């Protein structure tokens, strides 16, 4: 069992707290005028991915390291219940349930490289790449001269997600989208 001391805390470090894995998303070392120095840490619960807590650790405290593994795999297919990912080196399949995939299911297209976070050999989180290229299935037609406008219109992409795109984007075009913000980035040539 490995432990991290507070002076080893870094953003992205994964630790165990109350029997559950957490990731450090913010770490601030505070040395008050009086009293003992401490670390004010913001943590994201990895099982749900949504719960964020703030905790204070005294300087020199030790916390158990989480046995978390991040694996780079490619998305293969979905059978309605599980999303399947493949390791292209040894062709091993890993199945992730809807809880692990979460809202990111809308960005998964065949052969999309993803990062699967495993805890106790079970997927607890799936993270798609920051940018994906998807085809526009439907949108209002563009009008000549719309290239210099900052007005956006809704467009439905191949995965069913709806994003706002500039007026010059037409049906059938491939666009680059930021998966973290669901925002249009550029048109793919």
Curated annotation (Swiss-Prot):
Report the SUPFAM superfamilies cross-referenced here. Answer: Nucleic acid-binding proteins (SSF50249), Translation proteins SH3-like domain (SSF50104)
**Where found?**
Cytoplasm
Q: Do you know which Pfam families this protein is assigned to? A: EFP, EFP_N, Elong-fact-P_C
Residue positions, PTM N6-(3,6-diaminohexanoyl)-5-hydroxylysine: 34
The UniProt entry, under Gene3D superfamilies, shows: 2.30.30.30, Nucleic acid-binding proteins
GO CC entries: cytoplasm
Describe the processing and modification events after translation: May be beta-lysylated on the epsilon-amino group of Lys-34 by the combined action of EpmA and EpmB, and then hydroxylated on the C5 position of the same residue by EpmC (if this protein is present). Lysylation is critical for the stimulatory effect of EF-P on peptide-bond formation. The lysylation moiety may extend toward the peptidyltransferase center and stabilize the terminal 3-CCA end of the tRNA. Hydroxylation of the C5 position on Lys-34 may allow additional potential stabilizing hydrogen-bond interactions with the P-tRNA.
For this entry, list what GO says about its biological process: peptide biosynthetic process
GO molecular-function term, one example from the UniProt record? translation elongation factor activity
Q: List the disulfide bonds.
A: none
Name the PROSITE patterns for this protein: EFP (PS01275)
Keyword Cytoplasm set for record: yes
Record's InterPro entries? Elong-fact-P_C, NA-bd_OB-fold, Rib_uL2_dom2, Transl_elong_fac_P/YeiP, Transl_elong_KOW-like, Transl_elong_P/YeiP_cen, Transl_elong_P/YeiP_CS, Transl_elongation_fac_P
Q: What keyword terms does UniProt attach to this protein? A: Cytoplasm, Elongation factor, Hydroxylation, Protein biosynthesis
The keyword Transcription is annotated on this UniProt entry: no
Specify the pathway.
Protein biosynthesis; polypeptide chain elongation
Extract the PANTHER family matched here.
ELONGATION FACTOR P (PTHR30053), ELONGATION FACTOR P (EF-P) FAMILY PROTEIN (PTHR30053:SF12)
**Function description:** Involved in peptide bond synthesis. Alleviates ribosome stalling that occurs when 3 or more consecutive Pro residues or the sequence PPG is present in a protein, possibly by augmenting the peptidyl transferase activity of the ribosome. Modification of Lys-34 is required for alleviation.
The family note in this entry says: Belongs to the elongation factor P family.
Question: Which protein is depicted?
Answer: Elongation factor P
Species annotation: Baumannia cicadellinicola subsp. Homalodisca coagulata
**Which gene is the coding source of this polypeptide chain?**
efp
